[in-house]
Each structure stands twice: as C-alpha cells, then as structure tokens.
Amino acid sequence: MKTKTAAAATCLVALLVVVLAEAAGVGGTTVTYNDRSLVIDGERRIIISGSIHYPRSTPEMWPDLIKKAKEGGLDAIETYVFWNGHEPHRRQYNFVGNYDIVRFFKEIQNAGLYAILRIGPYICGEWNYGGLPAWLRDIPGMQFRLHNAPFENEMEIFTTLIVNKMKDANMFAGQGGPIILAQIENEYGNIMGQLNNNQSASEYIHWCADMANKQNVGVPWIMCQQDSDVPHNVVNTCNGFYCHDWFPNRTGIPKIWTENWTGWFKAWDKPDFHRSAEDIAFAVAMFFQKRGGPYITTSYDYDAPLDEYGNLRQPKYGHLKDLHSVIKSIEKILVHGEYVDTNYSDKVTVTKYTLDSTSACFINNRNDNMDVNVTLDGTTHLLPAWSVSILPDCKTVAFNSAKIKAQTTVMVNKAKMVEKEPESLKWSWMRENLTPFMTDEKGSYRKNELLEQIVTSTDQSDYLWYRTSINHKGEASYTLFVNTTGHELYAFVNGMLVGQNHSPNGHFVFQLESPAKLHDGKNYISLLSATIGLKNYGPLFEKMPAGIVGGPVKLIDNNGKGIDLSNSSWSYKAGLAGEYRQIHLDKPGCTWDNNNGTVPINKPFTWYKTTFQAPAGEDTVVVDLLGLNKGVAWVNGNNLGRYWPSYTAAEMGGCHHCDYRGVFQAEGDGQKCLTGCGEPSQRFYHVPRSFLKNGEPNTVILFEEAGGDPSHVSFRTVAAGSVCASAEVGDTITLSCGQHSKTISAINVTSFGVARGQCGAYKGGCESKAAYKAFTEACLGKESCTVQITNAVTGSGCLSNVLTVQASC
C-alpha cells in the first residue's frame, strides 16, 4: 500500500517577506522588477507571504489555514506543485480532493491574497522522489534532471498542463488572478557540481528557463538556490536559515529569500527540531537591515507558526505577526529610501534609512553571548545578544527580535468526550492472507535475478514479494542470509516467518540472518521487502536502489558453506492481498473476528477494526497510536499515513538545552532546542474533521505489519491548555484561548520577576495581588483579554518591572 498521498494535514505556513502590490483584485496586473524590488503596476510594495502545501491538508481546511495566515500579517501564499500526486500513472491525472490545485488558488484569491506558483516540477519537499513520478524510470533513456529528451519532454508536458490549468482559470496576475511569481526547478545549484556531467547539467538548467519563459505566463520566473550558471531570463533566489549575506548573481534583479526555514523536518529516529521565534525574527530583521526589504522571503518547513493541525504555534505566530506589523509601518522608506551602515563595535551595526524628512533605523547585535548598549541620537538602547531592534523613527524601539510580547500557548491532548460511549474501543480483527505468497507460484513474472524494487513495483505499493523454491534431500538447518538495500525485510521459509529486520538510522544497506529449516523435497522461500518512502534529494537520487536488488541471498550451513540463491528463478508480486481487496475501505464481504472480545496482540500482518463517535465540539481530533508497532491507519477510508510509534527518537545533546542565541543548525554538531528524545518519533495522528461523521459510527482500520497492541489506541482532542505572557510596566498583555469559543477559566500566576519553570507549570517569583485582581476581573470567562501593566498592579516590594502571567483555558 502507498501512503505518499496520505491526507494527514501538514500545514507549513510561516513568515515570508516580499515586495509586491496590494491585494489581488479584478483586472490585469503587471509584474516586473528592478534591483530594489518587484514592481507591481508601477509601484514598489512589501508583501509578507508563507507556504501552505495543499495536498498536506484537506480542502475543507484550506479557508481556515489561509485566513489564519492573513491574520498573521501575510499577504501571499506559495505552494509547490506535486507532480507524482497529479500524475500517479502516465497520462492519468488527479485534480480532485486535496489535489484540486485550482480550487486551492481560488481560495487564496477569495481571501484577497497573492500566490506564488512553484511548479518545479522537482520540489524536494520531504516528498517521495521529490515529487517526480516513479514511472519516469520506465521510459527508455531517462535521466532525471539532466539534458535528455525523455525527461525534458515529460517535464514540459506536465509544466504546460499546470500552466494551462491556471490560465484557463484566470489565475495569473495579468488575467486578474493572484499568481505574481512562478518557479521552475528547485535547488538545482546544490547538486550541479555532483552530477559528473557539468555540460549536461548546464544545458538542462538553461533549457528549463527557456521552456518556462515560452509558457507566456506574464509574471517573472524564479529559480531557488541557483547561485552559479544562472540563466539570464530567471531571478535566482536564496533558501536557508539566514540569507542576509546572500546576493543575487547579477545587478538589476531583487534579492529574494524563497525559503526561510522555521524548523526542520522530522525523521523516524530523530527528535523534534525547534527553531526559536527569537532566532527567526533575528534572521528576518537582519535581511531587511541589509538591503531595505523589497524582497521575498518564504518561511517553510516544520515547527512553523501554524502547526500540522492548523492551530497557532505561539509565541512564534504572534512574535512574527508583530514583526510583520512593524515592517509594514516603514514600508515606503524601506523600498524607496537611501541607507547608511555604521559599525559601532565588533558585531554591532546601525543601519539608517532616510527618505525626504523621515528615517528608520535597525540596530543589530550579532554577538551570541553579550548584551550591548548603543547610543543613537542621544538615546541609549539596551540590545540583547543575537537580536535586532527596529526603530521606525530612529528614536523609539518598536520591535526587538529577542523580546517576545506575544503569548505562549501550551496545547494539550484531552480524552474525547462522547456521551454514553464506553471508554475503551471494541476491536475486531482479521489476519492478512499470506498463503498465496508462501509459494513461488502465481507471480506477476519471473526472472533469474534479484530485481530492484521501485522499478518492479513502479512505486504502487510499499511491498514487493521475492519468492523462490529449492529442492533439498533430507532435513537440514541453515542460516538464511539476505543482503538488501531496504528499507525493511520479512523472511518466510515454508510459510513460517523466520526473521525481520529494518535499516538502522537511514543506512539502507543491511543484512538479515535468520534460522531456516528445510525439509525433504521442495522448499519455498518468500521474502517481503518494504519501503518507507523514497529518497527525495541529492544527485542522481533516482538511482539509489531499494529492495533485494542483486542480493546475495544464501542458505549457509553449519560449516559455513553456502547455497547461493541469487540467480535462482524468482517470482515477483507487488502488494499484499489486503491491498487488492481494499480492506481499508471496509467493503462488504470482509469477515472480521472479535473472538468474544479477545483480540490477538503482537501478531504481525494483522488488520484491526473498530468504530468510534466523533468527539464533541470543533477542536482538533487526533488518534493516539501508542502500543502499536508499525503499519498504516485509515479513518472512514481516508489514509492517515504510516505509523511507527515503536521507533523511538535517539538521545541527543540538543534535547537538554535551548538558547536562542547563536546560529541555528539542523545537521552536524551544535544542534539545540530538540524535544522528544527517547520518545516515539510520532504517536499522534491528525484526523481532519472533514473525515468524520457526526452522530453515527466512524470506522478506523489499522494494518499492523510488525505486531502491536491496539488496546491502547484512543481518540483525543487538541486545544489550548495554558497561556502565558510577559511584559514590562507600560506595556500591555493580551491573552487568548484561541478559537472555538474557548474561554479563560483561571489565572494561575501573576508574578513580577523571573518565573521559574515553563508555561503551564510556572512557579511565581514575587506575586502581585493587584495584578491577580486585574487579570481575574478582565479575563475570567472571556475568550481573550488585554490588560495594561501599570505601576498600580506591581507587587509590593517586587524589584522587577516585568510581569509574567499564566492562565488556564
């Protein structure tokens, strides 16, 4: 079964800064550029944008995600285009459901936002094959992302298809639509030098640009991470954690930051990466300081300001919203003004923008362990380490990247509340029918060699059976040895499961050694190879094999002598019987057993089914799959994705400290701000409300591949549990329990000075009864509240003028 198109929502919305026009409206819009900005209808503008990948959420979620993005100060939404989702089989297209790309762009337009169409069609995106269809490999002479007719023909056909769909729907700016930029290829410059064919790579990237421009879309084309050999008819852009020191390859084009990574992707064996709101704001403020801000920057990736469920991730969302607001307030001077840099000391710089009689200033402290005082026009400003202050009038600090005023929200998982429903789920079960695969008969075809899995299965299933037989005289014991390029392998001898193994930590070449008893006569060996997604990045990634390609496969006796089966007659069959029967759709004709309430546990290749009532309310619904091992989950026939809660995240030093100061990095030494070490890599899976039926049973089906215990599975809701905020005397504190009419139920802490612990478990310092009274009166029973911090609410004898408040929702 394939899970690459699983509908579990992953919203990647975050910060992005660009120079554009006002909200997209009726009538054609011209989009050009110069060395300072994009120019829309002759006017320079700054626009804030972010990324939402339409296949990673449901169409019903799109309006709310886009609305929250806009409320966070964004003016544009960008997305990749997912080729293998739209064309899973050659010339068989999919533009429905969460692949209805035109509907997605219309939702953006309806919200009054701009859009950026990143066709690629190679996208990376932590997506199978980087979005390229596996069937491309079946075409003779095919070489991915090099100058060759087979690849370029297919790429042009798909690119033209997408462009024409957008033209037919009047989605480009010149047609009155929201799309103001389009992208061709993606991060090709990162791998060009590793392809061992510089001429072909150069010819290919120039062909891409020429092909794109022939589409006549009426908006500029961009290329990400193309720092050398840049075609003259595209704008090259920057991706990364920091882009303030990056510049385009030539004059006359604007400096564009297409991906500002707000975190990092999650792997099965890795903890969660968190990039602090302070560091993201620091990077963006430096980017504006360096060249004035008429540019595009896209925040992309995980730990984003909207989480995978579409909830606000605070304080990141609020802190960046505050930054967006300040940048907008000095928009005109940034895009038209002249600027001067002044170095005050090592790693401390002041940049002053001037336009007519107005000015705006940035003060930058790049020291990662030292606060500094900077005197500007007679006023001294304290600047924390690793921060930027923005002074819209060069006098008053309106924003400092290290000082967060936005609230922190702690989301909690709550047991679902459904009246009259038993607490535990009642499961029935069915064993996967392995019998047809336990002999080497009835395969799709035979070969006297061990084939590569992706080519053989065309990526239509995670599973491929390799089956052979051997005639043996008498009984004997052997060790079955299999060398495989993974990602996972199960071995059966004469119908009995004798061993299982998977690749450790992404090192896909591994061995399986299992005891094997042969009887007199014909013996059958069945090997089930499983993939867990396909490589999406790097040079020639399509040539990375999967499965038992080449082997060897041997039977080794007690004396070390081997019988090499690698060139035996192997029968091949992709998929499992349950896939062909579509058990996950719960069709009539499937016989489920409840065994009088006793459910088998820790049995590999078992299907489980239960029903549940949708949790009341509108909060996010998740299913907790703790207790299971490895498999796939569906709700009402909708794929939630692969699960593997038995795979725990490694212990890493970064799990034990988090300091926003200093360079953030996701790879190599120096990782920090990690959580979840030693815990399941993922145990909670989003169940979009649109998947659920209210007032009637909902069906969940699990395919447990490795053997687990479903008795611990439960459905829960996710909502704000605690909210916290800090502010100095003279400022205000705003608290909110978020959406769905959640109200503030208690004020837990009102403390001046440093509160100990973390939000949700703060221990107060110097408690203020006056502050407690003020927040109780203003906030209890309210969805949100704002309180001015005055001297009247300071605690008696409290030395600090910073108040920390914690409330329960």
Curated annotation (Swiss-Prot):
Top-level EC class: hydrolase
Q: Which residues form the active site?
A: 187, 259
Q: Which GO molecular-function terms appear in the entry? A: beta-galactosidase activity; carbohydrate binding
Q: What is the lineage of its organism?
A: Eukaryota, Viridiplantae, Streptophyta, Embryophyta, Tracheophyta
Family matches, as Gene3D superfamilies: 2.60.120.740, Galactose-binding domain-like, Glycosidases
The alphabetical list of record keywords is: Apoplast, Glycoprotein, Glycosidase, Hydrolase, Secreted, Signal
Which InterPro entries does this chain map to?
A: BetaGal_gal-bd, Galactose-bd-like_sf, GHD, Gly_Hdrlase_35_cat, Glyco_hydro_35_CS, Glycoside_Hdrlase_35, Glycoside_hydrolase_SF, Lectin_gal-bd_dom
For this UniProt entry, what is the primary localization, expressed as one broad class? secreted
Example of a GO biological process term: galactose catabolic process
Protein name as it appears in the record? Putative beta-galactosidase 10
GO CC, any one term: vacuole
Glycan attachment residues as annotated in the record: 198, 249, 260, 343, 373, 483, 567, 596, 748
Signal peptide annotation: 1-23
The catalytic activity of this protein is classed by the Enzyme Commission as: 3.2.1.23
SUEL-type lectin domain: which residues? 727-809
- UniProt-listed CDD domains: Gal_Rha_Lectin_BGal
Q: Catalytic activity, per the record? A: Hydrolysis of terminal non-reducing beta-D-galactose residues in beta-D-galactosides
Q: Which family does it belong to?
A: Belongs to the glycosyl hydrolase 35 family.
Enumerate the subcellular locations listed in this protein's record, separating them with semicolons. Secreted, Extracellular space, Apoplast
